[in-house]
């Protein structure tokens, strides 16, 4: 049975999450609250919220866990040309934290295959906006001709980034934002992005699954590191164009 958490109740061990044979693998707990303090504690333990309007707050820690190692980010020949154009043409901009709430709302409105409605509710937007104001959540945004056309947002503690959602109004706009994030994190020696759950799109970009035990162990170490700077320089993206994917960083995680 999934435990119900009162305001002062701690999270159970992630090992108590429902298993693959259940109808909701990875479900750990439920609660009525989504306080920033609860959200911060969750991420530091490798737990995230995911629920729909009308449901209680559901907390998850799936096994295995989908991650993206920045050194393993895959760039196709076609996308390489796109990145070169973004770097070359001033009409393309990559901004950080310029319109965090706008990115969240756009992610909420983006159509998703096989999904009706959105889990990015008004309550979720309020909670993550609180983290953003505290400097713990960030948006990476793709702008074209002065208009935001894509982006992503996530949570950052220490040397760990937890990706949440992305959207694109024009082709490749979300992928450009992800490439910018990868380049920025590589610059700051962050070796793992949490992607939560497996999708074919993430796998095509180099994402892969690792055991929850290995994921949680890495999170525990990474969140204790000093926070990274979120001053962004577009030129760091150029480093992705001349460097092949490396398996070096991957050696720290089991496959």
Curated annotation (Swiss-Prot):
Protein name: Leucyl/phenylalanyl-tRNA--protein transferase
Keyword Glycoprotein: no
Location in or out of the cell: Cytoplasm
Keyword terms: Acyltransferase, Cytoplasm, Transferase
Gene Ontology molecular function: any one: leucyl-tRNA--protein transferase activity
Pfam families given in the database record: Leu_Phe_trans (PF03588)
UniProt keyword Heme present: no
InterPro entries linked: Acyl_CoA_acyltransferase, Leu/Phe-tRNA_Trfase, Leu/Phe-tRNA_Trfase_C, Leu/Phe-tRNA_Trfase_N
Organism this protein belongs to: Burkholderia thailandensis (strain ATCC 700388 / DSM 13276 / CCUG 48851 / CIP 106301 / E264)
GO biological process: one example: protein catabolic process
Cellular component annotations (GO), alphabetically ordered: cytoplasm
Disulphides: none
Role of this protein: Functions in the N-end rule pathway of protein degradation where it conjugates Leu, Phe and, less efficiently, Met from aminoacyl-tRNAs to the N-termini of proteins containing an N-terminal arginine or lysine.
Segments passing through the bilayer: none
Family of the protein in this entry: Belongs to the L/F-transferase family.
EC nos: 2.3.2.6
Catalytic activity: N-terminal L-lysyl-[protein] + L-leucyl-tRNA(Leu) = N-terminal L-leucyl-L-lysyl-[protein] + tRNA(Leu) + H(+); N-terminal L-arginyl-[protein] + L-leucyl-tRNA(Leu) = N-terminal L-leucyl-L-arginyl-[protein] + tRNA(Leu) + H(+); L-phenylalanyl-tRNA(Phe) + an N-terminal L-alpha-aminoacyl-[protein] = an N-terminal L-phenylalanyl-L-alpha-aminoacyl-[protein] + tRNA(Phe)
